[in-house]
Amino acid sequence: MVGIIGAGQMGNGIAHVAALAGYDVGINDLRTEAIEKARSIIERNMSRQVSRSLITDAEMQAALRRIRFAPDLETIGEMDLVIEAATEDESVKRKIFTDLCPKLKPSAILATNTSSISITRLASVTDRPERFIGMHFMNPVPMMQLVELIRGIATEDDTFVAARSFVESLGKVTAVSEDFPAFIVNRILLPMINEAVYTLYEGVGTVESIDKAMRLGANHPMGPLELADFIGLDTCLSVMQVLYEGL
């Protein structure tokens, strides 16, 4: 069974793909409204897949039955793998892991979906740094193929192998990163987005021109400013702060 902490955009996306891959999933969030929104989003996104003949209606209904939505952590002790997918704030994540560990069975693996924060630092607040790993899914999870895997200093080989097997069972591809600030994707992507913001600030081009230039000139599917909005400017800022402080 797979537990997911955080029912936001990343959490509901991970629940979506895990349930379709045949896993029983528990998605937890203290905000009842977030749980209900996640349920609605997952149903809507799966319905779109049905309409595009990517999955059948029977597969959708079976996947939805595999997901349990809960505003508490009562069922978390049953989980073999727990993935934290909360906001990109280290203090929030550390508190989640501190509260979570006493409720988990000893064999459970803990993963974080952080896009930038040190895996070793997050693992240090847990009772199982050897069973802790970074598992950075890309947004939107149902569409994006890549997952970055990041070992902390204490992550054991068995944990890494189990995490990689899980990711591959979802039909995803892994890229292994060392535990450096922002890992691989965001180490490259966020400075580019930041430079696009400066290009706008300095009047080099309009929003439309900058995005068009990168779509058509660099073959990017989405312009950097549009992408920043899609990621969330708060998340972009958090990652840039990690890069500023860590490099």
What are these regions (language model features)?
Residues 1-45, 52, 103:
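NAD(P)+-binding Rossmann beta1-loop-alpha1 motif at the extreme N-terminus of oxidoreductases
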